[in-house]
Amino acid sequence: MNLQHHFLIAMPALQDPIFRRSVVYICEHNQDGAMGIIVNKPLENLQIEGILEKLKITPESRDSAIRLDKAVMLGGPLAEDRGFILHTPPSRFASSIRISDNTVITTSRDVLETLGTQQQPSDVLVALGYASWDKGQLEQELLDNAWLTAPADLNILFKTPIAERWREAAKLIGIDILTMPGVAGHA
Protein backbone atom coordinates (compact mmCIF):
# COMPACT_ATOMS: atom_id res chain seq x y z
CA MET A 1 0.00 0.00 0.00
CA ASN A 2 1.43 3.33 -1.07
CA LEU A 3 -0.48 6.39 0.09
CA GLN A 4 1.62 9.04 -1.65
CA HIS A 5 -0.75 11.64 -3.19
CA HIS A 6 -3.58 10.53 -0.88
CA PHE A 7 -5.44 12.22 1.93
CA LEU A 8 -5.46 10.92 5.47
CA ILE A 9 -8.78 11.93 6.99
CA ALA A 10 -8.90 11.92 10.78
CA MET A 11 -11.63 9.73 12.20
CA PRO A 12 -14.04 11.56 14.54
CA ALA A 13 -12.69 9.71 17.59
CA LEU A 14 -9.13 11.00 17.00
CA GLN A 15 -8.74 13.64 19.72
CA ASP A 16 -5.07 14.62 19.40
CA PRO A 17 -5.22 18.44 19.36
CA ILE A 18 -3.05 18.75 16.26
CA PHE A 19 -4.68 15.99 14.23
CA ARG A 20 -8.30 16.28 15.40
CA ARG A 21 -10.52 16.69 12.30
CA SER A 22 -7.45 17.04 10.13
CA VAL A 23 -6.81 16.26 6.50
CA VAL A 24 -3.19 15.33 5.80
CA TYR A 25 -1.85 15.31 2.26
CA ILE A 26 0.71 12.48 2.02
CA CYS A 27 3.80 13.71 0.16
CA GLU A 28 5.89 10.58 0.59
CA HIS A 29 5.14 7.03 1.70
CA ASN A 30 7.59 4.16 1.42
CA GLN A 31 9.03 1.26 3.41
CA ASP A 32 10.80 3.71 5.76
CA GLY A 33 7.68 5.67 6.76
CA ALA A 34 5.56 8.57 5.60
CA MET A 35 5.61 12.37 5.47
CA GLY A 36 2.66 14.68 4.98
CA ILE A 37 1.27 18.18 5.36
CA ILE A 38 -1.92 19.03 7.27
CA VAL A 39 -3.98 21.07 4.80
CA ASN A 40 -6.89 22.27 6.94
CA LYS A 41 -5.40 23.77 10.11
CA PRO A 42 -4.76 27.49 9.53
CA LEU A 43 -2.27 29.21 11.79
CA GLU A 44 -3.91 32.03 13.71
CA ASN A 45 -3.28 35.48 12.25
CA LEU A 46 -0.72 34.34 9.68
CA GLN A 47 -1.20 34.78 5.97
CA ILE A 48 1.10 34.35 2.99
CA GLU A 49 1.71 38.09 2.78
CA GLY A 50 2.90 38.05 6.42
CA ILE A 51 5.44 35.31 5.65
CA LEU A 52 6.75 37.33 2.68
CA GLU A 53 7.05 40.46 4.82
CA LYS A 54 8.86 38.57 7.59
CA LEU A 55 11.34 37.18 5.05
CA LYS A 56 11.68 40.60 3.39
CA ILE A 57 10.47 39.27 0.04
CA THR A 58 8.99 42.04 -2.09
CA PRO A 59 8.74 41.00 -5.72
CA GLU A 60 9.39 43.80 -8.20
CA SER A 61 6.78 42.46 -10.59
CA ARG A 62 4.01 42.20 -7.96
CA ASP A 63 0.56 41.70 -9.51
CA SER A 64 -2.01 43.25 -7.18
CA ALA A 65 -4.73 41.04 -8.71
CA ILE A 66 -3.10 37.97 -7.12
CA ARG A 67 -4.30 37.62 -3.54
CA LEU A 68 -1.75 36.91 -0.83
CA ASP A 69 -4.20 36.99 2.06
CA LYS A 70 -4.54 33.20 2.10
CA ALA A 71 -4.00 31.50 5.44
CA VAL A 72 -0.77 29.65 6.19
CA MET A 73 -1.38 26.11 7.47
CA LEU A 74 0.09 24.31 10.45
CA GLY A 75 1.57 21.52 8.35
CA GLY A 76 2.29 19.35 11.36
CA PRO A 77 4.05 19.18 14.71
CA LEU A 78 7.59 18.78 13.34
CA ALA A 79 9.89 21.62 12.16
CA GLU A 80 7.19 24.24 12.65
CA ASP A 81 9.69 26.96 11.73
CA ARG A 82 10.26 25.42 8.29
CA GLY A 83 8.14 26.25 5.25
CA PHE A 84 6.64 23.73 2.86
CA ILE A 85 4.86 24.92 -0.26
CA LEU A 86 2.49 22.54 -2.01
CA HIS A 87 1.74 23.71 -5.52
CA THR A 88 0.84 22.72 -9.02
CA PRO A 89 3.64 22.33 -11.60
CA PRO A 90 6.04 23.54 -12.80
CA SER A 91 8.74 22.26 -10.48
CA ARG A 92 11.46 24.62 -11.67
CA PHE A 93 12.49 25.65 -8.17
CA ALA A 94 15.74 24.75 -6.38
CA SER A 95 14.25 22.29 -3.87
CA SER A 96 11.18 20.78 -5.50
CA ILE A 97 9.96 17.21 -5.44
CA ARG A 98 7.18 16.10 -7.75
CA ILE A 99 4.60 14.15 -5.75
CA SER A 100 2.22 13.43 -8.63
CA ASP A 101 1.62 14.69 -12.15
CA ASN A 102 -0.29 17.61 -10.63
CA THR A 103 1.41 18.33 -7.30
CA VAL A 104 4.85 19.43 -6.22
CA ILE A 105 6.33 20.26 -2.82
CA THR A 106 9.01 22.95 -2.63
CA THR A 107 11.05 24.05 0.36
CA SER A 108 13.31 26.67 -1.23
CA ARG A 109 12.95 30.44 -1.02
CA ASP A 110 12.74 30.86 -4.80
CA VAL A 111 9.12 29.66 -4.89
CA LEU A 112 8.20 32.30 -2.29
CA GLU A 113 9.80 34.96 -4.48
CA THR A 114 7.28 34.16 -7.24
CA LEU A 115 4.22 34.51 -5.01
CA GLY A 116 2.10 37.46 -6.00
CA THR A 117 3.63 37.59 -9.47
CA GLN A 118 2.65 36.12 -12.83
CA GLN A 119 5.42 33.52 -12.32
CA GLN A 120 3.82 31.86 -9.29
CA PRO A 121 2.32 28.38 -9.70
CA SER A 122 -1.41 28.51 -10.42
CA ASP A 123 -2.34 26.83 -7.11
CA VAL A 124 -0.36 27.22 -3.87
CA LEU A 125 -0.71 26.09 -0.25
CA VAL A 126 1.87 27.35 2.24
CA ALA A 127 2.46 25.43 5.48
CA LEU A 128 4.84 25.63 8.41
CA GLY A 129 5.84 22.24 9.78
CA TYR A 130 5.07 18.71 8.69
CA ALA A 131 3.84 15.37 9.98
CA SER A 132 5.90 12.19 9.87
CA TRP A 133 5.40 8.51 10.64
CA ASP A 134 8.14 5.96 11.27
CA LYS A 135 8.29 2.61 9.51
CA GLY A 136 5.00 0.79 10.11
CA GLN A 137 3.55 3.55 12.32
CA LEU A 138 1.04 4.89 9.80
CA GLU A 139 -0.03 1.38 8.84
CA GLN A 140 -0.69 0.63 12.52
CA GLU A 141 -2.70 3.84 12.93
CA LEU A 142 -4.79 2.78 9.92
CA LEU A 143 -5.38 -0.64 11.51
CA ASP A 144 -6.38 1.17 14.72
CA ASN A 145 -9.01 3.12 12.73
CA ALA A 146 -7.44 6.51 13.43
CA TRP A 147 -7.64 7.51 9.75
CA LEU A 148 -9.63 7.09 6.58
CA THR A 149 -7.77 7.35 3.27
CA ALA A 150 -8.83 8.76 -0.08
CA PRO A 151 -7.01 9.61 -3.29
CA ALA A 152 -6.06 13.29 -3.15
CA ASP A 153 -8.28 15.77 -4.94
CA LEU A 154 -6.72 19.02 -6.14
CA ASN A 155 -9.95 20.94 -5.73
CA ILE A 156 -10.08 20.02 -2.04
CA LEU A 157 -6.35 20.61 -1.62
CA PHE A 158 -6.29 24.09 -3.14
CA LYS A 159 -9.80 25.50 -3.61
CA THR A 160 -12.26 24.12 -1.04
CA PRO A 161 -12.71 26.49 1.92
CA ILE A 162 -10.46 25.35 4.76
CA ALA A 163 -13.31 24.70 7.21
CA GLU A 164 -14.96 22.32 4.70
CA ARG A 165 -11.93 20.22 3.72
CA TRP A 166 -12.37 17.52 6.39
CA ARG A 167 -15.98 16.82 5.41
CA GLU A 168 -15.34 17.14 1.67
CA ALA A 169 -12.35 14.78 1.79
CA ALA A 170 -14.50 12.11 3.49
CA LYS A 171 -17.17 12.58 0.81
CA LEU A 172 -14.58 11.41 -1.75
CA ILE A 173 -15.13 7.90 -0.38
CA GLY A 174 -18.87 8.29 0.12
CA ILE A 175 -18.85 9.09 3.84
CA ASP A 176 -20.63 11.92 5.63
CA ILE A 177 -18.12 12.14 8.44
CA LEU A 178 -20.36 14.36 10.56
CA THR A 179 -22.82 11.49 11.01
CA MET A 180 -20.20 9.00 12.19
CA PRO A 181 -19.97 8.01 15.86
CA GLY A 182 -17.69 10.33 17.78
CA VAL A 183 -19.04 13.54 16.23
CA ALA A 184 -21.21 15.00 18.97
CA GLY A 185 -24.38 16.80 18.01
CA HIS A 186 -24.48 15.78 14.35
CA ALA A 187 -26.03 12.30 14.37
UniProtKB/Swiss-Prot annotation:
One of its GO terms (cellular component) is cytosol. It comes from the Bacteria. Pfam families: DUF179. NCBIfam families: PRK00228.1-1. Belongs to the UPF0301 (AlgH) family. This is UPF0301 protein YqgE.
